[in-house]
């Protein structure tokens, strides 16, 4: 059970991709390169854990989750992610996530320390629609025992 809670906390943290900043429009061509930054509150409403191999923590164990992305209490998108345990010694999982907004999606991935409450960065690996060719990073403020939602600050580079 402790493993499941740690993995769920990591999932919510990764999901934690808050308020008052609108989702940016697509950059127009011909303008100088600039950074676009926005924040969302990430919630997890569906989650499933797959315990592979021997019962308990083992390489290849997975967690799959999804949920809405919010700004100012309003849903502005949704997320889906898969985390796979890649190191028992380092308590690491490889997470791959997609964040879907009106007009496009942003993909991201990172190695995450399972159960850690420390903030961390996630690499933006691409996008579609108005986020086509997206690059940059996401600063993650993980969920905690007192705040079940995480905060994601997207830093998109044109």
Enumerate the language-model features and the residues they cover.
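Intrinsically disordered, low-complexity sequence elements enriched in Ser/Thr/Gly/Pro
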Residues: 1-2, 15, 34-37
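Residue-identity detector for glycine
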Residues: 2, 6, 27-30
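Sec-dependent N-terminal signal peptides
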Residues: 3-18, 22
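C-terminal region of N-terminal signal peptides and the immediate post-cleavage residues
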Residues: 18-34
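Beta-strand-enriched cores of mature, soluble protein domains
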Residues: 29-158
């Amino acid at each position: 059970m402790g493993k499941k809670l740690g993995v769920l906390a990591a999932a919510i943290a990764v999901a934690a991709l808050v308020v008052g900043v609108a989702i940016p429009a697509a950059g127009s061509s011909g303008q100088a390169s600039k950074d676009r930054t926005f924040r969302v509150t990430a919630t997890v409403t569906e989650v499933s854990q797959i315990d592979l191999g021997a019962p308990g923590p083992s390489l290849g164990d997975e967690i799959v989750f999804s949920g809405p992305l919010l700004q100012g209490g309003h849903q502005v998108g949704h997320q889906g992610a898969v985390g796979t345990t890649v190191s028992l010694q380092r308590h690491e999982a490889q997470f791959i996530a997609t964040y879907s907004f009106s007009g496009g999606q942003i993909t991201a991935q990172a190695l995450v320390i399972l159960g850690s409450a420390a903030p961390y960065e996630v690499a933006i690996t691409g996008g579609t629609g108005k986020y086509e060719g997206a690059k940059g990073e996401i600063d993650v403020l993980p969920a905690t025992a007192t705040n079940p939602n995480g905060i994601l600050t997207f830093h998109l580079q044109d």
